[in-house]
Amino acid sequence: MKTFLISTLSLWAIAMQAQETQSISTGQGYNQQCYVNLAEGTGQQKANTSWDIAFSVAPEDAGIFINESVGSAQGALPIQAYFTVSDDFNAVPEPAFFEGYPLYNRETSWAYGALNEYHEPGNPNDFGWGVYDPGTQEINGIYVYAIQLRDGSYLKLQVQSLINGVYTFRYANFDGSGEVTKTISKSDHAGKMLAYFSFQTGTTVDIEPANGFDLIFCRYYDLLHQGGDSVQYLVTGILSADGVEVAEARQVNPDSVKYQDYVDSLSTIPDIIGQDRKVLT
């Protein structure tokens, strides 16, 4: 059983300089994610295998994420997405080619996930998986992605559109068999950060606590620098929810540190706490 201890001033907005300690569990061998509500002192665990991909439901966003969280058991696999560099859903993806184009969530924004990679920098109409048409106010999908599931098998996936707040996407086995088309409406997930989907069940999954959350304790891939190289490495860390502001105060006394000293450092980037600010017991 892996347990994290947080001793933090994250409740400043509720009770200035009130310090509390909360114990958070991510299950045996990191096999769970934990969604924490700091104000209520609660944590809700969900199995890593509960969901596979997730869609942003914020009005102006079109982010699509993969579930990188995986337990530490030998041979356990996360969900992995690959860019096939093809727009032909009928074509059979070739692993020898697409395995050179793995995609990862960047943990720098809840507006852009793994399937938003390869968008044109500086072009606000390019969302990677599709392009926004100002005339029709629709995002039309382009590319096909290869998705490796936790059992090692593959699906091909194409997000076809985002129209009037409704995502339409299709997926199938590489040979085209078992093709399924699904829709996810943002309005069905009002008040949530993401709409979560499981390929195993073919349905959306209720993941986030009903009372909201501030932090997620999970495993994810982070770009780490080793010597002169940069490597995507599976880490255990803490991500802040969309809109939650975080400031890092290093080498301070928790009993005397002042909120006012860090107001200008507050940021909504999800990985401010990240993978290097934890204590394991």
Which residues are covered by each model-predicted region?
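Bacterial Sec-dependent N-terminal signal peptides
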Residues: 1-22
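Surface-exposed, beta-sheet-biased, low-hydrophobicity segments with strongly acidic/polar composition
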Residues: 19-281
